[in-house]
């Protein structure tokens, strides 16, 4: 559930933060998760990427559709690969206190659609472009 669904008072939409905009119920995988399971989750739930976390929720990577397709192009057998084999390790992320404008700039500059939200090194949520739009519209209902 989006945290912005709980906005019920006046708020300048531009001051909304990742902590307010993010979805905190996040599907994840571990570095040991097999790639076919990841692909099943991505296609079943219509995700373009899946955060890779350790047992303590430390964000260690991201598996995207691009990563999976790159493995296919390279002729790798997806049945024999784990997330650690194909994941992007240098993950662009945001912190809970980053505001809507800062996050929107990252989306526009880096051509991404979803970003992990971290507290230190721990994954606490995901924020998508659509979450920014939803939060903006919701906040505008109360702001003049």
Each predicted region: which residue ranges?
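Tandem CBS (Cystathionine beta-synthase) repeat/Bateman regulatory domains
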Residues: 1-144
């Amino acid at each position: 559930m989006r945290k912005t669904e709980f906005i019920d008072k006046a708020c300048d939409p531009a001051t909304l933060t990742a902590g307010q905009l993010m979805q905190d119920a996040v599907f994840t995988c571990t570095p040991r998760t097999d790639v076919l399971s990841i692909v099943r989750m991505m296609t079943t739930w219509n995700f373009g990427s899946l955060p890779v976390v350790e047992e303590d929720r430390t964000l260690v990577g991201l598996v995207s559709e691009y990563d999976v397709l790159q493995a296919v192009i390279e002729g790798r057998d997806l049945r024999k690969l784990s997330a650690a084999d194909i994941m992007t390790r240098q993950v662009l992320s945001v912190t809970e206190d980053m505001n809507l404008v800062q996050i929107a700039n990252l989306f526009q500059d880096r051509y991404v659609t979803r970003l992990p939200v971290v507290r230190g090194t721990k994954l606490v949520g995901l924020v998508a472009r659509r979450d920014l739009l939803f939060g903006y519209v919701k906040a505008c209902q109360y702001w003049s």
